[in-house]
Amino acid sequence: KNGKCVFDDVVNELAPKFEEADGLVVASPVYYASANATLIAVLDRLFYSTHFDKTMKVGASVTCARRGGCSATFDELNKYFTISNMPVAPSQYWNSIHGREKGEAVWDEEGKQTLRVLAGNMSFLMKSIALGREQFGLPEKEERVFTHFIR
């Protein structure tokens, strides 16, 4: 109710930083085709407890795995952005990098390139939105309509 999580921990430390930021990058290793459970708990609490407008803050997610599960985890993380009116920064491939042991991801040339392109695109998108906000303002928000499927 007050824009803070009832559990007074790192989530309440992140919230004011997120409010001031133009974008948010979230990264996770892949466990059973899913993001790290602690990260998901933080994101659930952060996005649920904060009441500031997240519209047009740019989101980006990055995953790291030995082999599979990256695209499912990528989708899981991006859902926080898309339900919050946040555009998602693109790259030339899904934002993942591969490695099994510590330090191995440095050998994933395609993954590193994908993340470099992501960084450039995210920077460009945040700058473009800032210029658009100055010149045109943000899109007009509609009053939320909620549909209940059980009547």
Regions found by a protein language model. Give the residues of each.
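Helix-loop-strand module that forms the ligand-binding subsite of alpha/beta enzymes
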Residues: 3-93
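Short, hinge-like loop/turn segments at secondary-structure boundaries
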Residues: 1, 78, 107-109
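Glycine-rich phosphate/pyrophosphate-binding loop and the adjoining helix
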Residues: 87-151
